[in-house]
Amino acid sequence: MNRKTTRILSILAALAIAMAGASLPAFAQTAQKPVTLKVGATPIPHGDLLNLIKADLLAQGIKLEVIELTDYVTPNILLADKQLDANFFQHTPYLANFASERKLALEPAGQVFVAPLGLYSRKYKKVADIPAGSTIAIPNDPTNEARALMLFQNKGLIKLAPDAGLKATIRDIVENPKKFVFREIEAPQLPRTLDDAAASVINGSFATQAGFFPARDNLIIEGAESPYANIVAVRKGDAKDWRVVALV
């Protein structure tokens, strides 16, 4: 088993929900010359997983072109500008918030898997070992900031205002027994904070790129109840494109 396969399987082992994957339906509609499907994705695991199904899609008349992108903004901008046919890196709450703020006509085409958000540290092995008053880095985009705070609440580390919901921010923290200082950072930069912060809340894909194995190295991690399934996103009206249906 090569390193790439091991890396992918490590993430999938941590995913409580495997909702789709390399098992694709057969289509009568295929072309003699393959039709290109251009998909933007973050490299790990999304890009790796797409590369694994290229042969399956080619057999259905689709040439899958994977464009690897390393941030959470560019994939949606390129999709809206018709430079991509689809993207694969985000969950529905993030897409809904991003599309609303930027006034983009984008929609989910289908759910794929949950990439769990987890707490990681290079200094501590258990969350109980993190000293009171320590700095914890969390994502600064609205949906993933709320997601990180709900992770802490679900583990009994903080308490949020009852009406905070999926838009919770650090201002909604009403109880913080260990007086953690939450520092908001752009998601791709979170692994870099580990030299300074006591711990950082990092998405599974960025954690893997930083050398962590989510199933093994987390201090705390989302469970199977997480509503944040990663999706394939498309422009509105394209969800039934036969190439997209084959992908999802």
Region annotations inferred by a language model:
Residues V66-I77, A164-R192:
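Short helix-initiation/N-cap motifs at beta->coil->alpha
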Residues P116-V127, A229-R243:
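A bilobed periplasmic-binding-protein/Venus flytrap-type ligand-binding module shared by bacterial periplasmic
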Residues E68-Y72, K82-Q83, N87-A96, V112-F113, ...:
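Beta->alpha turn/N-cap motifs
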Residues K33-I44, I62-E68, T135-I136:
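Short, well-ordered beta-strand elements
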Residues N97-A109, Y124, D196, V201, ...:
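Ligand-binding "clamshell"
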